[in-house]
């Protein structure tokens, strides 16, 4: 039974189950305390947007503790954009070009009209942009994590930017923290997918790929 402010819904029999119930894995994300508890109690994979390594580690620790309170174990996923080129200089130039014609006022309007503009997660993405700007680091909140893409959109607001080895190292650092699933994208999507497949995917130990 879902009994919310705007939606009242009965599902008989309930059809949402975790993967243990022989259905696809249930991915769930959210940084609010309520969202974290929902994920800890019911999700198979807790999915998060980009953040600094220290913050990601803190979130994973918190979610493990919450899940243990329900005698459960969570898996973790990471959603980010990627800009990879043969050299770091080329990757950074591609990132700069991506937003080179953006009017900051238009970017702010895009973010503010999004339905999730007041969410905990979106506020955290904004905090990272502000921190990068305050540091004068060219929108990089930490090594190879670029928040510039978030100036033109809501939601997932950072990209892993670098040469193939740097991008791989960043992904491996997340894996060492305990992240198992990655949802990656870029602009234009097909072009960045091809570049990731060319430069990074061959360096990753992975199973069979299907399209």
Task: Label each residue range with its predicted role.
Residues 36-40, 172:
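Alpha-helical segments flanking ligand/cofactor-binding loops in enzyme cores
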Residues 21-25:
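A local structural motif
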Residues 26-29, 44-48, 74-80, 182-184:
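Hydrophobic faces of well-ordered beta-strands that scaffold small-molecule active sites
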Residues 41-42, 177:
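Structural motif
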Residues 50-53, 184-197:
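Glycine-rich, proline-tolerant flexible connector loops at the mouths of alpha/beta enzymes
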Residues 1-19, 51-176, 205-211:
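An alpha-helical appendage that flanks or caps ligand/catalytic pockets
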């Amino acid at each position: 039974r879902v009994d919310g402010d705007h939606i009242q819904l009965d599902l008989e029999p309930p059809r949402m189950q975790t993967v243990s119930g022989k259905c696809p894995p249930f991915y769930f994300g959210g940084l609010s305390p309520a969202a974290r508890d929902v994920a800890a109690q019911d999700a198979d994979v807790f999915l998060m947007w980009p953040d600094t390594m220290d913050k990601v580690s803190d979130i994973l620790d918190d979610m493990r503790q919450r899940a243990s309170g329900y005698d459960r174990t969570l898996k973790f996923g990471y959603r980010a954009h990627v800009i990879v080129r043969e050299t770091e200089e080329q990757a950074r130039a591609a990132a700069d070009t991506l937003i080179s014609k953006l009017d900051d006022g238009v970017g702010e309007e895009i973010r503010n009209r999004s339905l999730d503009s007041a969410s905990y997660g979106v506020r955290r993405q904004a905090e990272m942009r502000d921190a990068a700007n305050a540091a004068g680091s060219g929108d990089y909140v930490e090594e190879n994590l670029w928040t510039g893409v978030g100036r033109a959109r809501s939601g997932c607001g950072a990209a892993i930017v670098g040469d193939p080895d740097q991008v791989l190292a960043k992904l491996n650092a997340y894996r060492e923290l305990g992240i198992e699933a990655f949802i990656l994208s870029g602009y234009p999507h097909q072009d960045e997918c091809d570049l990731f497949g060319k430069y990074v995917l061959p360096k990753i130990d992975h199973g069979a790929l299907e399209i």
